[in-house]
Amino acid sequence: MSGGKSGTKLSSFQNLQQIGQGGFGVVYSAQRENGEKVAIKKIGNAASQTRIKEEIKTMKLLRHRNIVQFYETFFENGETYLVMELCEGGSLMDYVKQKGPLDDSTAVHILRQLIAAVKYIHDENILHRDLSAGNVFIKDATKSTITVKLGDFGLATNLGQHGTACTIVGTPGFIAPQVFGQNYDQAADVYSLGAVLYTMLTKHTPPTKGPPNLESLKKRNPSAADLVERMMHTDARRRIQLKEIVMTDYVKAKMGEATPGSREHSRDSRSQRSREPFRSSRDGISLERRPPARSSSQPVNSRRDPDGYRAAHEMPTTSRTSVEPDRARVRHRLSARGIGSSQEDDLRQQIWPIRMERLVGQRVRTPGGRYIVEMNTRCRFEVVSKGNIVLRILVVEYDPHLLIQTVYVHKMSNRVEHARNETDDLIELTRSPISYTSLSQLPKEVMNDYMRLEKMMVSTIASRVAKITHRRPSQFPDASAQLMENGDLRIRFPNSLIVRRKSNGEVHNYIDGFANNKEEVRGLQLSKVREVYACLTQLEQCLSRMNPTMKILPMVFSAGPDIVATYNNSPSSILPSTSSQASRFPFSEISSSQQLVPHSAPIPNKPLSSRTTSSLNVRNGVSSDENTAPAATRQKYKARLDPVTGRIVSVQAEDNRKLRCSTSKPDQFIFTDPSISSSEQRFMRNGRVPERASEMLHALLVYMKKKQN
């Protein structure tokens, strides 16, 4: 096929080669003038215009990493052309025919991607209706990680809520039996998905009549045969549901494996869950991404570092040597709006969208500008030029409902704004920003700003926020160990700070908390650091497998000798029976006859003793009751009475930290810590509590409770 007459839209594409043909059109690979490779589907004028419009409408609507991305459409000589993402690996059917049956790990890896795509279109009330191995495409068959894309939505149909379809369509062998009865719903796609799994495991297409013969598959892997049988059950009412597939023995047994053909796209499972990429778009539509999940998908919260170790905190945790060259190449390639290499593809997954969960409230001021996390879905970068003038403001927002990240650029061309300090008010935004919805749309200047913002979020801001805090671990009884949001481990002593970098595994002790006064940790101390790190990371993994509706993170807990002994054997067994997050949730005024209700923490496998939970935890140092605190804790703080009302209104620590009740709002508190800043920190009882104010808040409330009684 030629590129068309000069001056036409088709003539702007080069190197057109036919790569596929179906009943509704011919597909070509092509190349844009900027070098980007795309797929072009040519639909003849004999095709139904209604069907063409439906396919275009459906493809424009769908944005998901495992669905072929639609770029644009144009019409020439009575024919319709659809420009889409090119999957150079060909169809899954051709791949299996060439390579033979896939191993179980690879099959499960592909199945999980297809489940995600099918679930997404079902959530949009869309049936694919032609889900077959021939319509599943491999992005790049030369890569060790197989990424598949669901394509060809020419037969897709939109269902109303709880609706059904009534047209016989699909690929023989992959069609559910109820389709022939012309009354079917989303369960039909599950049947087709089972047929795809059967093809991957056997290399054969399912029979057009009757169920497939699974005898040979049962001998090889009974659990795989059982899943295929349940997915291809002739009775739609008894067919396994889409959401249940990932919980079957066959899938669960292979989810943790990382073979060359089945390892996950990201470097660790958390990145895989939380960083689904957007792809390039030619009409402002970007690829879908799953909602962000951090460990156990908990609500956002953040804690600023409670001490003055600012110099050590702000040391980058991402190696510039390994990352910067890649990022430079990405900036160069993406500025030309081209699809990058596999390395750039992987990097694109890491940097779009930006992770903001549980980082809300963080601020950083550098000579280049001010970085602020306004909400768990919104951050900004106020870009500063020479002369301390704000050039523009980059605002990044993530919509958890539409699953889209948008970058807004506010240019300060009509007014002069001077750079502000870290804690100053936000600069007012312009009314007409320029918006971008995919990484490839960003011009070079905006790309540079975006990369700076993303790096600051990962290397500095995430290293300030603690995910899990273990006070007084058995290995270091006079310290507090923290697993940070970026994966670093920080063990805080009265006069030093031990840091284990996740990026390179290096462990250093920062004397007095300064970056220029450090020493490498060795010997027995290094072994203890590794023990603490292993315990906290295992605890994090345990929490990540819990019900995502439970509000767990961030977690702060203390453990006495009895519990620590158990903790060293099994991290999951030491979780407090009531929430250890003293600073995270509200505690009402509870009378002596009422029982304190546990909040959002798991119940231990075995009761620690017959004593009540609160008394046992106080004895062991696990503070779980907001209305009680050990006497030693209360004695550390001096209470002050209001001379008029006689009520306790504040407490003060020996190091001059002060916590007082607000006079303007009944549930608001004001905290000052001179060792960090002279400014006041205001927080609500049921909001984010500064960590160094947590214990003081306990004591203040106990004092107030006793005074009332």
From Swiss-Prot:
Query: Where is each Protein kinase domain found?
Result: 13-251
Name the source's superkingdom.
Eukaryota
**Composition bias type Polar residues, residue spans:** 607-627
Q: Which UniProt keywords apply?
A: ATP-binding, Cell cycle, Cytoplasm, Cytoskeleton, Developmental protein, Kinase, Nucleotide-binding, Serine/threonine-protein kinase, Transferase
| GO CC, any one term | nucleus
* Annotated positions binding ATP: 19-27, 41
List the biased-composition ranges (Basic and acidic residues): 262-291, 302-313
**Active site per the UniProt annotation:** 130 (proton acceptor)
Q: What does this protein do?
A: Protein kinase that plays a central role in centrosome duplication. Paternal copy is required to regulate synthesis of daughter centrioles prior to fertilization. Maternal copy regulates centrosome duplication during later cell cycles. Functions upstream of sas-5 and sas-6, and is required for their localization to the centrosome.
Q: What is this protein called?
A: Probable serine/threonine-protein kinase zyg-1
Lineage of producing organism: Eukaryota, Metazoa, Ecdysozoa, Nematoda, Chromadorea
Query: What's the encoding gene here?
Result: zyg-1
